[in-house]
Amino acid sequence: FLWCFQRFFVYSASGRQRFNVLGALNAMTREVVTITNNSYINALSVCDLLHALAAKHTGEVVTLFLDNARYQKCGLVQALAEQLKIELIYLPAYSPNLNLIERLWRHVKQQVLYSRYYDSFPKFQTAIMDCINGTQSDNRESLRTLFSLKFQIIEKSQILNT
């Protein structure tokens, strides 16, 4: 136990409001395209992201690396990706280290959530979006190492040879 003569109150967020961000990170330019909502991420959210990517990169080849979430592998998403000429590549299961957007989410949590208090939900949302939108300008040096494209390639593995 720790005793003190004066009480110290720590502010914390009240309520259970939800703010979801679904994003795609350009590995070369560090540009982020996001879709946000206040409900749940589902196949329609992924379709919105595909439309946003297609609109932003008209006439360009777009390859999107995804994890194996069920809503990202459904027929609706795959059909739309084919229609928009977006190549979908699914990463191996349980490999968030290969997904660069997971590194961005970790960075956002560290910058926005750790030891921070927001007295209103809109301020919380703004802080998250400002951090995400700052990936091209703020903290470029620390983000350069965070988004490194140096992945270990394993040529021969006992697991792959069995």
Would you name each region that the model predicts?
Residues 1-162:
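Short functional hotspots at interaction and active-site rims
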